[in-house]
UniProtKB/Swiss-Prot annotation:
Binding of heme, residues: 1086
Leading EC class: oxidoreductase
Cofactor list: heme b; heme
Name recorded for this polypeptide: Bifunctional dioxygenase (DOX)-epoxy alcohol synthase (EAS)
Sequence ranges of Polar residues compositional bias: 57-74
Induction: Expression is regulated by the MAP kinase PMK1, which is a key regulator of the infectious process.
Amino acid sequence: MDGAVRLDWTGLDLTGHEIHDGVPIASRVQVMVSFPLFKDQHIIMSSKESPSRKSSTIGQSTRNGSCQADTQKGQLPPVGEKPKPVKENPMKKLKEMSQRPLPTQHGDGTYPTEKKLTGIGEDLKHIRGYDVKTLLAMVKSKLKGEKLKDDKTMLMERVMQLVARLPTESKKRAELTDSLINELWESLDHPPLNYLGPEHSYRTPDGSYNHPFNPQLGAAGSRYARSVIPTVTPPGALPDPGLIFDSIMGRTPNSYRKHPNNVSSILWYWATIIIHDIFWTDPRDINTNKSSSYLDLAPLYGNSQEMQDSIRTFKDGRMKPDCYADKRLAGMPPGVSVLLIMFNRFHNHVAENLALINEGGRFNKPSDLLEGEAREAAWKKYDNDLFQVARLVTSGLYINITLVDYVRNIVNLNRVDTTWTLDPRQDAGAHVGTADGAERGTGNAVSAEFNLCYRWHSCISEKDSKFVEAQFQNIFGKPASEVRPDEMWKGFAKMEQNTPADPGQRTFGGFKRGPDGKFDDDDLVRCISEAVEDVAGAFGARNVPQAMKVVETMGIIQGRKWNVAGLNEFRKHFHLKPYSTFEDINSDPGVAEALRRLYDHPDNVELYPGLVAEEDKQPMVPGVGIAPTYTISRVVLSDAVCLVRGDRFYTTDFTPRNLTNWGYKEVDYDLSVNHGCVFYKLFIRAFPNHFKQNSVYAHYPMVVPSENKRILEALGRADLFDFEAPKYIPPRVNITSYGGAEYILETQEKYKVTWHEGLGFLMGEGGLKFMLSGDDPLHAQQRKCMAAQLYKDGWTEAVKAFYAGMMEELLVSKSYFLGNNKHRHVDIIRDVGNMVHVHFASQVFGLPLKTAKNPTGVFTEQEMYGILAAIFTTIFFDLDPSKSFPLRTKTREVCQKLAKLVEANVKLINKIPWSRGMFVGKPAKDEPLSIYGKTMIKGLKAHGLSDYDIAWSHVVPTSGAMVPNQAQVFAQAVDYYLSPAGMHYIPEIHMVALQPSTPETDALLLGYAMEGIRLAGTFGSYREAAVDDVVKEDNGRQVPVKAGDRVFVSFVDAARDPKHFPDPEVVNPRRPAKKYIHYGVGPHACLGRDASQIAITEMFRCLFRRRNVRRVPGPQGELKKVPRPGGFYVYMREDWGGLFPFPVTMRVMWDDE
């Protein structure tokens, strides 16, 4: 009976439960339900039935043996199968029981219980056909070594089915259950190593709580660890430390050896920072390390709360300008201090941008409604959150430079074309599809032995040796060679007392601070540049400066007090062959003989003197870069791995969630740029007005420039870099008034365009011929030629029809319903505004765009926009020097790929008259621009241009100049009208957009669009002064300009000039069109202005004729932008991991019932 519910039972079950109103209470009966959906099938709703009852179940045997039902579609949940009756022989059971012996084993008179597990034979009786498939799937997964499992196969559930069917006493059942439990257990850490809350999110000043369950492991103030247990009995009388230095360590006037690989002093300055980061022996107790055992950039941030507080401003997360916490570094060569100041500036850059971006509201400023202690506490938290996250980010750059730039030089990877690097943070395990690797984030404790391993004084250059000698003379009043160990500590203590407690008041290198607390950039750049040019010393015996004698003798004494193992014991611990002869230690006869006289037997050689006196390795490409002594080259790599892999802030907690997406990307390395090297980020961010974006001094400072030139020439990369010493680059001259802008842009003989450099870099000779590349007659002729092809008869109607049709097509195809299906949503920038111009340029210029209608294209819509936006940015908007090099190198690669494809297409069209080109499908008959691209190419050819010139001097640069700019103005105008300042104009725009297109309505819509652009646009243009001049601004200010100055004309203030725009904050769609300056004026005014205005008119019409256009709720509806000086903005990328010069994403919605 369709639609009826039928209950069926067979009376009382064997338990004799009572029946009320025909329904048994708690009886084991079968209840069957019939629904039309299930036809003649029945579903078992209760668990058990009489053995004689037969029934079917839905979904109890699917193709993989699972019991499933789709409860979302009206089906009832599945149930299990009816168990098979167990056949037993009562007489056999009775006989077994009667023959049992009396239970005498236990005192309580019970029989012992014996658990006897069944074997495979019994298991096979319970296995079904699909269980065999499950077993095979398990074996296959094991053999393939699958780490990530496809849970759509339901393998885990199928195993559960199999195990559930096996007998209770089955051995395989127990084994499979154990295996399942182990896998589930191992999916999580035990105990967990990562916890929530600021106390676990930020580094503590002293390094404690790096390991949550051993919080003092590696904290400042901890004891040194011991790496190797000393077992060899040392001689009763050891040689005098001073004699050891004179015999095998000290440098003589004729024995100095410069570094064989021409490594610069910068590498050793970096090593100095690392060494002082993790080692600070307490002079009152040499067993105690006053530093933490982590590379937490303590020389900058300090090892205690007091030290950290001394460098903070306690405002907006910033540090005091140009300072660092650790006084010890002030006594080092001044280049070390310059590196720390560069990190100081980077920290403040990070703190500023974290606040501006404010990812996820993480750094919201406290409410003005708070008062008293609550207000004070809120601002304190705001400052501390910014400071601590900025520290994590800055330390991230520190460790990336260490693991990529520094380590690549250590093992000579900088001389080969490889992206491999020894990054101890490399993840391993199931989630990355590899075997499990070494543990991460387990903490660290540095040892006394490694304190001795990191004393690389042989590598001090001649220049820095003189500095050390002068420092000793200044501190002790006598030459370093005359200073005794007992005087050493007293002298350093006195120096520390004389050093200002406030890091912001300290000086170094004879440099002076300015009124703003900063050092002069010219001084710092000169200092660090000279260090880049300074070849360091070589590792090995008899190369330590004489000025370091007292330091080295104290090191030998300290090693003896620590009772560290000898050189051979140390080597054996690291599985290195012990030395059997002194000639094995060093083949130099003089050094070997001195060691023999000092120690008698190689086993007696002490660790520290042995490490210094060992023979140094010769450079190997790759493999040996800094050419250390043999033992050092092995053990420092082990220590580097432990230092980094044990630090949770560089492993398990080094994530975008902790550093923010932007912070993580800001310091991340890209193996496709400089093979991952990121030192340039620190240099150029600290000194943007001195280091060019491609300065070899900034990119590869750990090798001297002359050697870098040899390396880069051999790798075929020398053309990417500038090898000149850095020098001051004057900042741009800013012109902000309407009249000043007109004057600069119209006076071509005095102010020249600056775009030739970017165009030439991207497109070579072809780019230099582009109409915007210069001010010569050639460029003016190129402009006329392109204008003649763009603006042919009927172009207005064709452009208008195209944008009207394409805008509607994209709004329909890219939008979607969410929620109650009454509102359509779309990303108006990413999926519509940017794309419509991509389609226009592709049709007009024959670009290889891949679409559903044109599947033979090469680049998708988003890829094409990305390429064209990168081209525009490189040529016209390359404003951030620290981001310029990766931008330019990556853009050139994709730009040339595009240009070569375009050139091939141009050749085909010009060679075969009837060809539509390589990338164009058959056009629709009503397609407005169906033959525009082909006609343009042939027209340019008719003007005498070569196929190369058409592609490289016209098509590609024109497309790059047009698409992102036009997309930008639409996005900014729409954003304005969706903002509180402009949203009350939307009803007026909507009414105009609903009316038929006429000259009047078109002009009115264009007026609204132009007003939105005027009020929200961020436009400007660069020129270079050819002569000295004085520019008179509208407010009477006179701006002096020197020949060679870069002049930036800002349209932001000019667009609000009340002289030209009365009531400038009010939208007036009827203002004279010629007043709008953002398309430029003069000889280089935007050639596509007329087409652009037709385009934005139709785009406004198409969008705003929709009802109730508005932002979607939440941050997806906002155009995320970050303010820059002069009223400009940059925009967050979609993942908020970086900044972009053009709007990226903003979602809107409208009513569509």
